[in-house]
């Protein structure tokens, strides 16, 4: 029976050992790049391709502002005879025909300025979209850095417990050979170690996509390096931090959030578009001068040409109505956006207050005491002062408690990050 148990556990143990070895080798083989949050933000601003593309979009829209202000080019028209009864290209004063006209389109009702205003609105919208992209990607970067640190803390809990159990298992193997303990007790502890090692594999695997996203955001040329965040927050300060008034936070969010600004810019665009569509209903004037050598009633005729469309069949009423309805539509979108911003800020504040209540300084003291108690329990089991069942139960409870505390601490930090994100500026300093 004992041999059967050993055979059953041998294969999964060997498999897990291989997986752990490969993962550990992969993590250890990587160069470790310790990175402060300000350094990460600097590299992100300099190197991120999405931000670079958005900057070019702003420049492209600015070029259209200059283009919209330009006048239309003058038009040169000419009509010259090729052949008449006297021969080819006879353009002297006595025979032949030459006709030349130069005309210029003059846009009325301030169409050029109104079109330039629309181009300016598009540029402002591109800036708002850039700022919103920056806000979103920065939030993703900082969240990923804090999440990597969270996973590394979890890994540290497992590493510490696994290291202690490996020492214990090594000693128990010697005791088993001496016949001082049973195979069952030896296998129970090894099974506990096996489960912890298996859970550690999942923790290390969870870090890989986070690192990949951080590398993608930073684009700093260190794709093969393991980025280890260096964070400077003090948890007791975060637990006791006092938030600004809700209404103040909401007003700040409404004023500063780029997506809110973008909605207001789009409303401005629709208002300016209505003015432009009304201007399009006004006819433009084409003015020119012409010279006619022989075709007119008088030789060498010089005249003034004026033309304009008659505003009878098309007064641009459809586009004007479309612009009016677009204003109403965008106003509804803006009202909904403002309501959503207020709701998101309120939810972020509620989360912080909840996790500040859940986390407390007594928990930090309890965690430190629990670490000491784990060492005492390990020593007591080695000295046969507690049973195997008590030791295993305590080990599971110790691990679960440590992980729950870490999750609660990280939840508070994420809630604070979320508030900064929803307001659109750092109202709470987390990393010092």
Regions found by a protein language model. Name each.
Residues 2-16:
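Bacterial N-terminal signal peptides that target proteins for export
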Residues 24-26:
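N-terminal signal peptide c-region/cleavage motif recognized by signal peptidases
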Residues 53-65, 133, 137-158, 167, ...:
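Amphipathic alpha-helical coiled-coil segments
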């Amino acid at each position: 029976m004992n041999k059967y148990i050993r055979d059953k556990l041998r294969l999964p143990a060997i498999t897990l050992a291989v997986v752990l070895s490969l993962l550990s080798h992969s993590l250890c083989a990587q160069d470790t790049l310790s990175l402060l949050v300000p350094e990460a933000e600097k590299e992100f601003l300099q190197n991120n391709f999405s931000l670079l593309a958005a900057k070019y979009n702003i420049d492209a829209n600015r070029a259209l502002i200059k283009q919209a202000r330009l006048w239309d080019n003058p038009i040169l028209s000419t009509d010259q005879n090729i052949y008449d009864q006297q021969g080819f290209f006879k353009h002297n004063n006595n025979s032949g025909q030459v006709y030349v006209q130069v005309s210029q389109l003059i846009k009325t009702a301030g169409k050029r300025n109104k079109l330039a205003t629309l181009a300016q609105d598009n540029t402002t919208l591109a800036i708002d979209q850039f700022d919103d992209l920056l806000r979103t990607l920065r939030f993703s970067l900082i969240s990923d850095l804090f999440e990597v640190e969270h996973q590394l803390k979890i890994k540290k809990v497992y590493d510490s417990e696994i290291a202690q159990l490996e020492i214990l298992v090594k000693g128990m193997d010697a005791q088993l050979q001496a016949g001082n303990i049973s195979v069952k007790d030896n296998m129970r502890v090894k099974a506990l170690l096996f489960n912890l090692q298996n859970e550690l594999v999942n923790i290390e695997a969870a870090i890989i996509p986070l690192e990949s996203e951080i590398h993608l955001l930073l684009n700093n040329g260190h794709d093969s390096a393991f980025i280890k965040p260096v964070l400077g927050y003090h948890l007791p300060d975060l637990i006791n931090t006092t938030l600004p008034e809700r209404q103040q936070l909401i007003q700040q969010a409404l004023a500063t959030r780029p997506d809110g600004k973008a909605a207001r810019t789009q409303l401005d665009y629709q208002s300016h578009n209505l003015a432009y569509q009304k201007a399009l209903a006004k006819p433009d004037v084409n003015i020119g001068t012409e010279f006619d050598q022989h075709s007119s009633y008088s030789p060498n005729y010089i005249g003034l040409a004026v033309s304009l469309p008659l505003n009878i069949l098309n007064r641009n009423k459809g586009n004007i109505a479309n612009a009016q309805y677009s204003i109403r539509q965008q106003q509804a979108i803006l009202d909904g956006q403002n309501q959503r911003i207020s709701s998101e800020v309120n939810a972020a504040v509620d989360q912080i207050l909840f996790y500040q209540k859940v986390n407390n300084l007594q928990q930090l003291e309890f965690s430190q005491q629990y670490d000491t108690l784990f060492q005492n329990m390990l020593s007591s089991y080695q000295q046969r002062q507690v049973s195997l069942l008590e030791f295993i139960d305590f080990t599971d409870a110790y691990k679960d408690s440590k992980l729950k505390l870490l999750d609660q601490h990280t939840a508070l930090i994420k809630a604070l990050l979320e508030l900064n994100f929803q307001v659109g500026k750092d109202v709470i300093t987390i990393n010092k």
